[in-house]
Amino acid sequence: MEAAAGGRGGFQPHPGLQKTLEQFHLSSMSSLGGPAAFSARWAQEAYKKESAKEAGAAAVPAPVPAAAEPPPVLHLPAIQPPPPVLPGPFFMPSDRSTERCETVLEGETISCFVVGGEKRLCLPQILNSVLRDFSLQQINSVCDELHTYCSRCTADQLEILKVMGILPFSAPSCGLITKTDAERLCNALLYGGAYPPPCKKELAASLALGLELSERSVRVYHECFGKCKGLLVPELYSSPSAACIQCLDCRLMYPPHKFVVHSHKALENRTCHWGFDSANWRAYILLSQDYTGKEEQTRLGRCLDDVKEKFDYGNKYKRRVPRVSSEPPASIRKTDDTPSQHPTSSEKDKQSGWLRTLASPSSKSLGCVHPRQRLSAFRPWSPAVSTSDKELPPHLPALIRDSFYSYKSFETGVAPNVALAPPAQQKVVSSPPCATVVSRAPEPLATCVQPRKRKLAVDTPGAPETPVPVAAPEDDKDSEAEVEVESREEFTSSLSSLSSPSFTSSSSAKDLSSPGVHVPPVAPAAADAAAPADTPSSGLEAELEHLRQALEGGLDTKEAKEKFLHEVVKMRVKQEEKLSAALQAKRSLHQELEFLRVAKKEKLREATEAKRNLRKEIERLRAENEKKMKEANESRLRLKRELEQARQVRVCDKGCEAGRLRAKYSAQIEDLQVKLQHAEADREQLRADLLREREAREHLEKVVKELQEQLWPRPRSEATGGESTAELEP
């Protein structure tokens, strides 16, 4: 038995299996890709090599004395210490920011959201403005080459884009692309990084040779999306968008903000890029490592700083502090000279000192140090450097809040190997069959309440306080429900599902407690078992203590038994009264909950109707605005055509125009002269007519006078004859 126990205690797994399990564990804890990212083939090959070495060593004949053979000794593999227990993953709530901002991409203003510190641009707006000359097939092929991932916007972000008029109201979803991937995509499509035609290569080569030989050029490089070297000509940097950097590969000139995106080497398509912005080119362009002289480095570094300070209106670029010593620390050289040795305690101190040296401002101007120490504002993360030169602290805090256990608090794309910490253990309370069931079977996380609330519900088993943790999630769901028909139906179903267990528990408690009244007092243990567990813990403990004392004291006499039965009946009546009060309170709370549910449903319906009306009004206003914009565009085009015609008329030759005007004026003068002649003729004719009329009038007057002379003399003679007779009569 002892041998068996000793053999069982000293058992160790297979060395290859142990290494595989260790690497499997480390890969699963340090990678979001999970254990699938680890291949155990190299571990098996290493084990085969070790076993082959051991077999070769065993094959060498050893001198054995002929006197007696020693007993065979079983050599077990060396016991390796277990790997250190790594801390759990560091969980943080996902950033679901809905604050809209704007950014400039290739001269176009694009709407975006800042999510997790990275700008995520509206992809349809980019396709309709910056990349409008490219087909979707071309864009998709470039996205596949660059391994670009586009996420989907949330419902709130989609609603904001619709309200701002960026997307139509009929858009079901919208893609978001990071600013870094947008810069890469636009650069690959618009500029492409292609070489110039062969006919211009000699000219470009001669120009590049001239720039290299010139003392006014500075060799620079960047490490964004693959390293690229170039020649900076400070004199050509006359404007923020001036082409002043020549690529040494394609011999083309680029502005600084385009040069940091330009590359001909490995495009780092399988690298996770974050936080790139071409406007920060001052942090990406570095002085070339080819300059070895201290004075030359200082002079050219000052020249590069002067270029970076030009047109820096935001004063974002600050000059680097000059280094104190020109040589790197001794710890740096020692660390770089012996990278393969296992670090001892002193070497670990030196490594930490090297890290502090890199972090200090004095090392920021090192020009010709080890490539691992070069300062780069945009360098891909290297796992080899981090594992060999940096050490993780032994215990990292794994901050996981209770409120983050719900699946809605994390990103939907969490790797399956990331194990969430289990929620707080619920207290198991042994309750009689008639007790209200508080903790049910496990349900999906979407319908569970938070662990703290469940724990409070279990710790306080009183019936009046039971519906309180059930009603709290109702208010939370009401406040978070969207004003849509689907969310309204989900809200109603969740209310019904949460309210149905309370009905079941109350009815079951009522059915189980009502027949308990008729239980004869002969069975006190059964009556005690049928007592509800919804009473306060203090009263129940006091009654149990009273029963225990009575049972321990003994029931020898009849009076003691009757007194004991009387106490049991009294406790039973008291428990029934408490249970009925609890059921009544629960029923009233449920009625109030039903009333609130109906009221909330009515308010939700009104809000839905108001939102529908508002959406119709917005759609009508949008249609009117589109109509007005169409009319304005048509009027603008018409005015533009008229302006073009007037401009073409004015463009004619001035001499031709003067001759045409002279001919025009002479024709007008001739017409006026003809009209004047006609007017003179008409005037002469009118004068002749007037003379004829005057002669006719004079002739008529003469005729009238003759007629008057012929008529008037006779009456005058008669008058003279009458007067003479009158004079004779008297």
UniProtKB/Swiss-Prot annotation:
Q: Which InterPro entries match?
A: c-SKI_SMAD4-bd_dom, DHD_Ski, DNA-bd_dom_put_sf, SAND-like_dom_sf, SKI/SNO/DAC, Ski_DNA-bd_sf, Tscrpt_reg_SKI_SnoN
Q: Which GO terms describe its molecular function?
A: DNA-binding transcription factor activity, RNA polymerase II-specific; DNA-binding transcription repressor activity, RNA polymerase II-specific; protein kinase binding; RNA polymerase II cis-regulatory region sequence-specific DNA binding; SMAD binding; ubiquitin protein ligase binding; zinc ion binding
Q: Which cysteines are joined by disulfide bonds?
A: none
Q: Which UniProt keywords apply?
A: Coiled coil, Nucleus, Phosphoprotein, Proto-oncogene, Repeat, Ubl conjugation
Q: Where is the composition biased (Low complexity)?
A: 460-472, 492-508, 524-534
Processing after translation: Ubiquitinated by ARK2C, promoting proteasomal degradation, leading to enhance the BMP-Smad signaling.
User: Which stretches are tagged as biased composition: Acidic residues?
Assistant: 473-484
Question: What is the role of this chain?
Answer: May play a role in terminal differentiation of skeletal muscle cells but not in the determination of cells to the myogenic lineage. Functions as a repressor of TGF-beta signaling.
Quaternary data = Interacts with SMAD2, SMAD3 and SMAD4. Interacts with HIPK2. Part of a complex with HIPK2 and SMAD1/2/3. Interacts with PRDM16 and SMAD3; the interaction with PRDM16 promotes the recruitment SMAD3-HDAC1 complex on the promoter of TGF-beta target genes.
> PANTHER family, from UniProt?
SKI ONCOGENE, SKI ONCOGENE-RELATED
Name recorded for this polypeptide: Ski oncogene
UniProt organism field: Equus caballus (Horse)
Q: Which gene encodes it?
A: SKI
